[in-house]
């Protein structure tokens, strides 16, 4: 990958000039000028997904100049580097190959002179055999009963992805009850353990190194709880499996290393649901549906790696995001799925985006002088409409939004889905076009009221509009379409990082807090006052000690 400061390119300078021409142009004006705007600024994927980006503050010239930026920063070369197994995560000297985990074509992907696909397929086959034994009931717990509950213990990428996907695919789930424990707060595991039976519970401990503080603290508490009933340490092997690469530590914990499922250093945590970390997904929806998830992602991988930038959906969404973040000064993006099963989707890509592109140092090791990753947030519709949409509609901040919805629901109750989708369509229309003062006054006249007598209210009912949105309409949320949607966002994130000259696949920002926590932990063991920190931290620690005494 090349190390090019995007602001030093001629394309960036052209975009800055173009922004000066575009900053006061409204979405309403763009639609008024072009009756064919929707067809020009939308695209479908595999007849399963429609991406409408017409309600953005862009023209064909905007996209052309953004494409020039992608060319000048060698996005095509960056894509080729990732898919070919080059070590593009330079700060950790690692390849980035989550795409290999879903490489259903089985074409060789080489890292350090070795094709990784045989090992990928071997772990998949091992997960298939294990999951079929658990799901069928042929795997028995220490008292001879089949497993009824699965508890995934992990944090970050070892939790967010599997939890999001198992929730999104609940219509496909089997009889097993899935639980997820991530927080080192003892409340999290305590509440889960209240609802499971040690005789019929399987714990998945997801930690590559088997040393992650939060995960191993929870895993040891789970084992203690289990042994309080089971008694004999040998029973641990029937009720615990590991998603890890540290065979020694796994064995010492009491887990049979035959039930250790490996992954590789070229799998980043926040891109790991496709790996052994996805075992909880397989146990929830079955191996065949997991393969469909992989296949959907692989289809998007092929689209991303082979489609020209002008028609490449992840690239288009990434470029539009850069346009708002760097030229309009938009600091956030909202992800708003109109599907209750997708309620963890925004949280998943909050990590996916912010941990990937939340960097202020470029690939040359210099502080950037432009914007990198945005703040990502969101909640399912229509709940969000009754919470934070007020600010999106009438606040002082620009919040570009992605609206996501399925055309077909898994729960066709009465007219629920039509009402849900009527809101989905209405919100993007309202955000784009707003409501003028003239329309507000006419509405009063239609009600037989004189607008002049209501002048004190009229300004508050005006909507400026011109709020940008993308709409992603899926035919239906299936394992395949969900896989494609996740990969769409993954590649959008990669594209932005490549163009913005940052390392997307490391996360050094999570380290300092962990280091300091490890230093503070011994200081919390006794009641003596602490004076080794700044006055604020000392004061907080000492008050904590006083109150817990």
From Swiss-Prot:
CDD domains: SIS_PGI_1, SIS_PGI_2. Its EC number is 5.3.1.9. The active site is at 355 (proton donor), 386, 514. It holds the Pfam family PGI. It is an enzyme of class 5 (isomerase). One of its GO terms (cellular component) is cytosol. GO terms for molecular function: carbohydrate derivative binding; glucose-6-phosphate isomerase activity; monosaccharide binding. PROSITE patterns: P_GLUCOSE_ISOMERASE_1 (PS00765), P_GLUCOSE_ISOMERASE_2 (PS00174), P_GLUCOSE_ISOMERASE_3 (PS51463). It is found in: Cytoplasm. Its main location: cytoplasm. Keywords: Cytoplasm, Gluconeogenesis, Glycolysis, Isomerase. Catalyzes the reversible isomerization of glucose-6-phosphate to fructose-6-phosphate. This is Glucose-6-phosphate isomerase. It comes from Klebsiella pneumoniae subsp. pneumoniae (strain ATCC 700721 / MGH 78578).
